């Protein structure tokens, strides 16, 4: 087959395309068989999707555990050719059975099914309406599940997992007593998917609860007729999951191939920065041996790029890692989100739009805040999400300070003044369609005591409970104030480096104070106290120098008119409007004297603006076992927010922790520490003071919902639980009748070959005067139809037919010419 014909199915339309290696050629796998993989084969999977206005393509070559070396090499070659066909931009992945990446598993929401055999043993991917099946599937996992064909025996069972006995027209689900509701729900959805996609919706499904087998005697009879007498079930087997701490260790290597010898040189360890990557070279990034990335620079030769995967495999062998280690190769300029998140900061130069710009004291780079239309925030939650704003900050505000570990109200005239030695709670109330919504900010000063920090979190829980868990809780570390927090104080937010505002404990005002003022409107302006020295100045900002006798408002050359106007409003607040304006370069000598003398400061021309290139990511978090486990959910939708889970949405400049209504008490209580541990163990070396927002199911603000396409507030009230889906299956009567009929069919077995004695429909439709085969009972012609022909003729299964009244059966047989 020519490459042009093999890749004819490829387009820019968002979809999944799967090929199987058959006799060293590519063969398309039908859509109905997607997610089914034969253990003796190799596959190539192409994912095409749109991320904003950009096209994202990923090529995965999958290796079955029983596939041959020739098939594996062939799959690797076709992967390279497909990459070339698509212009070299896709991310390439090497996937090994049982060790697939979260990205790969995420494509198959209903789960992956491993099937025995392969091309060499004549196994084909069949189309819909095939009933000649007899297999036992071992289902593992809760979110991205995998189902493996195992021996048809009770010895295959264990108490912690779910098993599906698939008999073609009947699927029986057996739930291990120690399996959880999430696993049972996913297994049931897989059973329904098999029924609908492979059996045309005609198979019957039954469920046995492993700890209540006596409640399903009919279904247990079917299991024992098929598997033999029930034996003792094995104990549960724990899933091998790499915890977040293990994944946090990363190492970057430079790769060269001198005289045919692989040479790797250690470059750096965590935290990594983007500048370490030279565009003319190739690099390997080793994530604790759990995953290997190969980065191919734009200037690397074609030969070097094509050899990237083989270099990775050589590296794995050299390090003594398992051959199943996941490998991902990325191209310079088209890196995956998984790769970029391993770096402390990944930015794209010369862009003026995107997620959070960079600001830091003493450096020239600064934030450019754009104006936005407040009216869009609730009608278009995606705008609220991008702007990090639920409204314009004009709601009701209450402020408390932690004093002697208790909450003390802060008088209105002191709203907006925050001291680094204190902790505060700020409750913000706003209305949406006449219904109150709440945000509870927990502001923690840099110099607050450990007891005060703990008390602020504890008191926040108390306030939250007063409102029945409705408030969104936001932890704010000093200096990391979110935009909406600043908007609450309408451009009059002042942050003192230390001290306290408690009555009787106020410290005397120092003789000289310097405030850095940045922001260009009332939604993003604050004054932050910095060290009173010339080195603190920045040409792109406005500074207020305040003494007991005189005040100076210093305008940096790079500050804008809007920034200067907002600074004047803060002068009114801090100095009663009495401050001399000083332009950079025209400072009087006393200005420098007050700052301890003139010294160098950040006064170069404005740095090239950078836009952080980040992708919003969703994770399932768990610490039930004492280990912090994080599982990424790729291509996420609202349906991935399960009521029984705690989910983490990472937008890089802030982290949302979503708590499902059915999450266990331990995880609810440890929500904040869960988010903090995520930041601390993040392989890129994330800022541990990143704002954390704790959100409860049913109280999601638009800043959260805007990251999900077509958010539906009624999805959980309308969605069906495991028990509801189970009840829809009805009783086991039809299954018992079908299996009884299947047993009766053994009366028509050919003793010589053990195969059912079925006849083609046209043979059985012969008239009374035409001879039928000797062993066919003319009154029971339907018994000689294969399962597939039976459904084709009658439109119902054999079990459903048997359940009908005798007169109805006779009528149907007459109508179809079988009587």
UniProtKB/Swiss-Prot annotation:
Annotated signal peptide: none
Region (Headpiece): 732-819
Gene (UniProt): Avil
Region (Core): 1-731
Protein name listed in UniProt: Advillin
Subunit comment: Associates (via C-terminus) with actin. Interacts with F-actin. Interacts with SCARF1; the interaction occurs in embryonic dorsal root ganglions at 18 dpc and induces neurite-like outgrowth. Interacts with PLCE1. Interacts with ACTR2 and ACTR3; associates with the ARP2/3 complex.
Modified residues (Phosphotyrosine): 85, 748, 758
Required for interaction with F-actin, as annotated region: 628-819
